[in-house]
Amino acid sequence: MADSFDVIVVGGGHAGCEAAAAAARTGARTALVSMRRDMIGAMSCNPAIGGLGKGHLVREVDACDGLIARAADRAAIHYRMLNSSKGAAVQGPRVQADRKLYKAAIHDLLAELPSLEIVEGSAERLLLDDVSRGTSGLVLADGRELKAGAVVLATGTFLNARLHFGMDCRTGGRVGEAAAVGLAEQLRALDLPIARLKTGTPPRLDGRTIDWARLDRQPSDGEGWTFSALTPHRLVPQLACAITRTNQRTHDVIRAGLDRSPLFSGAITGVGPRYCPSIEDKVHRFGDRDGHQIFLEPEGLDDPTVYPNGVSTSLPEDVQLAMLRTVPGLERVEILQPGYAVEYDYIDPRALTAGLALRALPGLFCAGQINGTTGYEEAAAQGLAAGMNAAAFAAGRPEIHFDRATSYIGVMIDDLTLQGVSEPYRMLTARAEYRLRLRADNAGTRLTSWADAHGAISAARRMFHVEREARRIAMADCLDRRIAGSAELIAAGAAVAADHARRSLTEWLRFPEVGDAELTVLAPELVDVPEDVRAEVIQDGRYAPYLARQDQEIARLRADERIGLAVIVDYGAIAGLSNEMVERLNAARPADLAAAGRVRGVTPAALAAIMVHARRLAA
């Protein structure tokens, strides 16, 4: 085993795997350090990838040649497009994955990277350089020293972590795995801004003890879409999920057990995720609801384990079983593993740059739950960004920043580093101002060439993208050039009103009655264009007037981005800013005026004062 690398990544979860792969794809000699080699790529909680907002992140990681979408397709036993009845901008691709197949897929994809080495061991502490006052490597628990130009911490829930099973509290980052205590103590000793968060997971059920006949069946989508642009068709047999609901009897059992809940006894102090609350929290906060949905999700093709999505809990196991057996279809259910909560340390992400580098320790990057986020997809996206930037730092290249106007990854990193978090951060489509441009179906168009310019994609991805772009541009040109009147549209089957105007087919797409079927009648050559390319070009045409309006907004954003704020050392020196604004701006360190405007509580008047001060300092 080598002991010197360009980049070391600590943690083999979704963030760590993407970080290691991203660094290795650029040619950096990379070490992926994990306590257990066999747990690399494990799905710790929900056996699913994607969802609203989250599916956009997965497609963006895939556009940059990441792993998560390809692994999801190799393991997908259930596909579902969420919000399918709404506009394309807010539709969310999601798959249910076979845990074993997903982990195997990640191992196979990592094995394809020649400059990546997996190191089995527990990270004990960082090596610090007295001269650069930065990070120079890692010390493992067994005493081995690994040197590197950059280190990525992707420790998930393992930093100083504690597991809660009812009132039973024990040290651990996941069931059966130790917490990272030494590393957590070192980070606290370095006086970094560290606090606690909490997450939880539901009990795992024995599917052989579920009465499936009593439940609402939810089949996989019939359409043939896949997550990765490189996956031509679905690869795995499909399974159905099922839906049931809690009821008043369930809620009575939960309320009777709250005195034994660590969440309500004060044993848990960390804040949990707003958008994935525990079932006891739901019952407590929404006591007037007559029930809450439970999605019963199979964990694999040959695995009887079922994940009951919607009942995350840290109640004692006997209460969990009593609660579940009040639910229709679960009257005789058996628990294979009880649900539990985990509390862990995280670093205030306002201490990070837009490249996810820790300002206080040059060469140290952070990704995933250590930055205060929740979810596989958020972790994978940060891992991609941190890995690209760690490799760039080790090679002496400038930071690489994802743009808020062109990616959900940019939205997330901007939110984290400017606003910080008070609860685990989850991606939502509502967080993106320019979401009409940031559709899941056009991630490759938005990001693959950009990632290629930073040396982050493979030759196979580049070839695929070049061919796809040629087809997309050719189709868009065809629709722009082909002119038709309403009579021709009506003859093609479109229920449009008869008028005397002649329009390009692109303009006709603004009429909801005109779709793919009508276009292929008027332009038969489009039949040979791949379905995903046709869908993207059609959506571009439908949104065209609104996209033009957003382009004007983005132009104003770019103007403000040209007013840099690096010259401002202390915002307290600017007259007219409140103490609260000064505190938030000093913590966030916005790079430009546009970023300062996104810091919570900063007013237009304050922005004017900041701009004047910055120009005076730069003069």
UniProtKB/Swiss-Prot annotation:
One Pfam family of this chain: GIDA_C_1st
Compartment annotation: Cytoplasm
InterPro entries tied to this protein: FAD/NAD-bd_sf, GIDA_C_N, MnmG, MnmG-rel, MnmG-rel_CS, MnmG_C, MnmG_C_subdom, MnmG_C_subdom_sf
UniProt record, GO biological process: tRNA methylation; tRNA wobble uridine modification
Any one GO CC term of the record: cytosol
The keyword Methyltransferase belongs to this UniProt entry's keyword annotation: no
Domain of life: Bacteria
MF GO annotations: flavin adenine dinucleotide binding
Keywords linked to the UniProt accession: Cytoplasm, FAD, Flavoprotein, NAD, tRNA processing
Essential cofactor(s): FAD
Subunit structure comment from the entry: Homodimer. Heterotetramer of two MnmE and two MnmG subunits.
Family to which this protein belongs: Belongs to the MnmG family.
Task performed by this protein: NAD-binding protein involved in the addition of a carboxymethylaminomethyl (cmnm) group at the wobble position (U34) of certain tRNAs, forming tRNA-cmnm(5)s(2)U34.
Protein name listed in UniProt: tRNA uridine 5-carboxymethylaminomethyl modification enzyme MnmG
Gene: mnmG
